[in-house]
């Protein structure tokens, strides 16, 4: 009987899944670096590569550090309106709002991306409210609309979303994405908007109130991975999921036991907080810790980045994040990014998030690419397990 129940559960988790393909494309940082503009952008944004502080206080709108999106390479497709208007978005567990550029946006970034035209949608309604999101030293602002949103065949009715009419600076001009679809908790949503996934649950569009993320770190593969709504796919990981309780229902925040270098605890020795964030490509932590970590791995600041010689990766240490008693190892090949020409970028970035939200470590795509991640809203927990790398994919999925 127990085997039958396990098989039934597995069938539900696999065959009731809605799979959203993720494509992998060039990040903003890599594009700017190739153009020789990266250092200029840091200067323009007032960002110190050694120490970046998210200075948003309690009485300000929620802040999204601009550097979080500089290295994002994984994107998916959604549509808004009737008939559907298509957009490329970041599926971001570190925020909770959906926004896309508006046809009324006058910023340079909007002009080079797909823009939503409300007058062409028969199901569009105006909310009448404005919204604003902080990104680094600038803000993205616009109005809130209501319309149908489709994600890989899932039709979400009456979804509130932001229509941006102003986007900050020049950074988003080089972005491969049009907008962002937040998958965080409702408590961090701007404008009292109900997040897309919450509406999926409320409208009975998913089998289970959970979603999961698989990311390929193979630089030679155009296949980025997949976002799965309604459960998880056990063929994408090995072993058992380590279920970790969410400690604060805003971000997908969990307890981090410690951070080890070659088996020695050097950071977070008394335990600290971390978030699992698909909208942040790198692994970030308090700047004082990250400066020390960069020195240990031999990374040095150059060209607006932290770089290491790719030829010495085998001599660099292993970094381990201990979560719920289990060590999640990251080899040098896993925590660095190959830029070409024998140069690799460090996958670590300093980011000081002040109380009460911080301090926080952020386990971004560099980490998620090695560990399949399940986000369970029904039980408020995150599941982690080692990925089974691409290829192969089963049944052509």
From Swiss-Prot:
**Alphabetized UniProt keyword annotations:** Aspartyl protease, Disulfide bond, Endosome, Glycoprotein, Hydrolase, Protease, Signal, Zymogen
Tissue expression as described in the entry: Expressed predominantly in the larval foregut and the anterior and posterior adult stomach.
Q: Indicate yes or no for the key word Transcription regulation.
A: no
Propiece residues: 17-52
Principal EC category: hydrolase
Q: Which reaction does it catalyse?
A: Similar to cathepsin D, but slightly broader specificity
Domain Peptidase A1 span(s) in chain numbering: 74-385
Location of the active site? 92, 277
Q: Which residues are glycosylated?
A: 86, 130
One GO term in the molecular function aspect is: aspartic-type endopeptidase activity
Q: Key word Transmembrane present in the record? A: no
The UniProt entry, under InterPro entries, shows:
Aspartic_peptidase_A1, Aspartic_peptidase_AS, Aspartic_peptidase_N, Nuclear_transport_factor_2_euk, PEPTIDASE_A1, Peptidase_aspartic_dom_sf
Q: Which GO biological process annotations does it have?
A: antigen processing and presentation of exogenous peptide antigen via MHC class II; proteolysis
The record's annotation in Gene3D superfamilies points to:
6.10.140.60, Acid Proteases
Which cysteines form disulfides? 105-110, 268-272, 310-344
The record's account of how the chain is modified after translation: Glycosylated. Contains high mannose-type oligosaccharide.
Q: Which SUPFAM superfamilies match?
A: Acid proteases
A GO cellular component term found in this entry reads: endosome
Where is the protein localized? Endosome
**Highest taxon of source:** Eukaryota
Q: Which Pfam families match?
A: A1_Propeptide (PF07966), Asp (PF00026)
Q: What does this protein do?
A: May have a role in immune function. Probably involved in the processing of antigenic peptides during MHC class II-mediated antigen presentation.
PANTHER family, sorted = BETA-SITE APP-CLEAVING ENZYME, ISOFORM A-RELATED, CATHEPSIN E
What protein family does this chain belong to? Answer: Belongs to the peptidase A1 family.
Quaternary structure and partners: Homodimer; disulfide-linked.
Protein name in the entry: Cathepsin E-A
Q: What is the lineage of its organism?
A: Eukaryota, Metazoa, Chordata, Craniata, Vertebrata
Q: Which gene encodes it?
A: ctse-a
């Amino acid at each position: 009987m127990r085997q039958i129940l396990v098989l039934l559960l597995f069938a539900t988790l696999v065959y009731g899944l809605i799979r959203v393909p993720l494509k992998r494309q060039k990040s903003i940082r890599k594009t700017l670096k190739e153009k020789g503009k990266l250092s200029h952008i840091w200067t323009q944004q007032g960002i110190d590569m050694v120490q970046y502080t998210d200075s948003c206080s309690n009485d300000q709108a929620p802040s999204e550090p601009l550097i979080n999106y500089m290295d994002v390479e994984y994107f998916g497709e959604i549509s808004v309106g009737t008939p559907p208007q298509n957009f490329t978005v970041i599926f971001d567990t570190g925020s909770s709002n959906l926004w896309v550029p508006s046809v009324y946006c006058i910023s340079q970034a909007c002009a080079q991306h797909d823009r939503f035209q409300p007058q062409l949608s028969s199901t569009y309604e105006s909310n009448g409210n404005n919204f604003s999101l902080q990104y680094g030293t600038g803000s993205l602002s616009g109005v809130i609309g209501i319309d149908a949103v489709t994600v890989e065949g899932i039709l979400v009715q009456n979804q509130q979303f932001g229509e941006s009419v102003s986007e900050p600076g020049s950074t988003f001009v080089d972005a491969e994405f049009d907008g962002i679809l937040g998958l965080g908790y409702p408590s961090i949503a701007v404008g009292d908007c109900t997040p897309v996934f919450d509406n999926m649950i409320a409208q009975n569009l998913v089998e289970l109130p959970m979603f999961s993320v698989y990311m390929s770190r193979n630089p030679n593969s155009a296949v980025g991975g997949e976002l799965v709504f309604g459960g998880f796919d056990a063929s994408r990981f090995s072993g058992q999921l380590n279920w970790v309780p969410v400690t604060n229902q805003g971000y997908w925040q969990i307890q981090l036991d410690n951070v080890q270098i070659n088996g020695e605890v050097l950071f977070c020795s008394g335990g600290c907080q971390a978030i699992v964030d698909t909208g942040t490509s790198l692994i970030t932590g308090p700047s004082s810790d990250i400066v020390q970590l960069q020195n240990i791995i031999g990374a040095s600041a150059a060209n607006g980045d932290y770089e290491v010689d790719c030829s010495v990766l085998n001599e660099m240490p292993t970094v381990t994040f201990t979560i719920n008693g289990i060590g999640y190892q990251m080899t040098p090949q896993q925590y660095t990014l190959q830029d070409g020409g024998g140069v690799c970028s460090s996958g670590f970035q300093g980011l000081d998030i002040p109380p009460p939200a911080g301090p926080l470590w952020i386990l971004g795509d560099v980490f998620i690419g090695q560990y399949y991640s399940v986000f369970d809203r029904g039980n408020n927990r995150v599941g982690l397990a080692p990925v089974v790398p691409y290829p192969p994919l089963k049944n052509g999925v």
